[in-house]
């Protein structure tokens, strides 16, 4: 889980995460018009097909990033938030550190290849979890199957949205170096699981193996409550404090997945 890998378009989860933060903090609005720069328009790879001199809304850009995996949309939104993609990458790195993604370094908003643009599957899992927890309403974008912009309809590349009704996200990625990648999440009953797969040899393989991993995990692990929120879990003796004993607990209810039958 700690091996350095290229995240490819899985990068765009962080791009969207920062955009959702900006919306929450009222630094952006969904209907805000964004001017498309020549830089964004000329970005290579998967595209939403935005055009210079044709403003696009923040909401359209988010759909272009999440559903269509548009590199052009990612750069346009990065510029709207930070002024330049380079400045936005700095924000991405600062946010990664705050989330505990200590083995991740971003160089761009898209995931286009760069030797210094790397992460780990562990860090990707952290990012996916925080996206779902911190922006539960906005996470619904990842369940959308298609989006039409500029009269061009594109389908979500996450095949699991069609293959399994319990799957409600998240994001695909692909470069020659990264292979075919997929972070997927499914909720069955009260349980949600996230899987991260990188380096598959085809779109079909990444979908098939991700679904196998989800099914295996649901079948072979149970979720148990370790500690309730805001309840004393342990007591610790305090040296020269205002009290001899301090009660320690967790802010949020803590669940853990354990092998079934333990």
Locate the predicted segments by residue.
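Active-site-adjacent loops and short helices of periplasmic peptidoglycan-processing enzymes
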Residues: 1-125, 129-134
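Domain-terminus/edge residues, biased toward the C-terminal soluble/receptor-binding domains
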Residues: 102, 113-118, 122-262
